Amino acid sequence: MTRPPIIETRGLSKTFGGLVALDEVALQVEEGSITALIGPNGAGKTTLFNCLTGIYPPTRGRIIFRRPRDSETGPPLKTTLNDLRPDQITALGLARTFQNIRLFNNLTVLENVLIGCHPRMKAGLWGALMRTRRARAEERDMAEFSMLLLEKYGLGAAANDLAKNLPYGDQRRLEIIRALATGPRLLLLDEPAAGLNIAETNALDELIRLIRERENLSILLIEHDMTLVMSVSEKVWVMEYGRLIAAGAPGEIKNDPVVIRAYLGEG
């Protein structure tokens, strides 16, 4: 049975001067799925992520995010993300990681995750500055929540270590955990296996599956490691020159001559 999309784009285009980075992209991510987006370098994959998360405003088209119902019988709520700021999009339940790790290297592992909790906090700037009772209670709750996340996903013992002292694979893991701290319903992973060795990539495969199972969320990942893509994904979308050229199950994509010519057969 086809699940409803948690996010979809309709005719999404992005231009930079005369350069067309995205050209009428119509993509869907089914709720609860692990979906991959692949394509050669320069295909427009990260530009698409940047549009989904509010970093780039689309030139044309729509980005529609499906929110939870107000009640069990009510219709699903749909929000157009086009004109929202990145923080507003995060608050709706969309989080991402980046191809280049963006940790606070001189903060501890726990402090990095606490920063990810910021969108969940309700006390506001005034409460934080004045150290109100509510703000202090929230800080305690978020510290406990952050520690639980670290323990759940294998970094509990490193909570007080500086982020820069973690092995590279654990830095990738920390960035994903920090994204989870925002409380997402959709997690975007931009080349999470970049720079990982085989053992670290296998651990990442396990982590992605575990997160989907435990957190009941949807995952969209950009990835060049085709072994990981074929292992973990339920559906694969393929981009080339800013356009979607194929979509299907991993086995279908692997044997699609258009995809082989455009991407899988490179080199």
Task: Report the location of each language-model feature.
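Glycine-rich phosphate-binding loops of nucleotide-dependent enzymes
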Residues: 2-267
